[in-house]
């Protein structure tokens, strides 16, 4: 559900990700998290960056012709660390709308995620005075603007968890 609108400063992250199709991508996204947890990449990122928080970075870049977008698992780079293993990702300062949802049953994680996204894209955005800066058909595909997904705890393979989506927006 919609929580509030906030201003965020520019943030730098280190992470890794993949390109995935616009449609039917949730299983790919959750599999990426499962592999990150089992391979210890999340712990490695936390140590390298000096951060306890891990985020999903949704739609940092996209390819409109191929109808794909990126999904990264990343940590805020508080140590300004350099890495050949992980990608440097800069999220521009700006206005973000925050949405929250809780998933309490592992078998409902896709449903829970889709319900929150439906609220964002089908209810809140059409009735608000804002436009998403990652809207693929209009403004999207501008590197530096991405949605941040924060899972608490920072592992969506364990339930219950809270999902917080920070969506970059601007006035219409």
Predicted feature descriptions by range:
Residues 1-172:
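A solvent-exposed interaction/effector surface
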């Amino acid at each position: 559900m919609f929580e509030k609108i906030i201003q965020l400063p520019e943030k730098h992250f280190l992470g890794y990700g993949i390109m995935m199709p616009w449609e039917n991508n949730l299983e790919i996204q959750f599999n990426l998290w499962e592999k990150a947890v089992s391979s210890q990449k999340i712990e490695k990122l936390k140590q390298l960056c000096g951060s306890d928080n891990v985020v999903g970075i949704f739609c940092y870049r996209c390819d409109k012709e191929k109808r794909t977008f990126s999904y990264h698992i990343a940590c805020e780079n508080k140590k300004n660390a350099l890495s050949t293993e992980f990608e440097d990702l800069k999220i521009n300062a700006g206005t973000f709308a925050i949405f929250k949802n809780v998933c309490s049953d592992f078998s409902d994680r896709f449903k829970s995620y889709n319900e929150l996204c439906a609220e964002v894209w089908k209810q809140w955005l059409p009735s608000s005075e804002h436009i998403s800066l990652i809207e693929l058909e209009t403004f999207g595909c501008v590197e530096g603007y991405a949605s941040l997904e924060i899972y608490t705890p920072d592992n969506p393979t364990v339930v219950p968890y809270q999902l917080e989506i920070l969506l970059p927006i601007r006035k219409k």
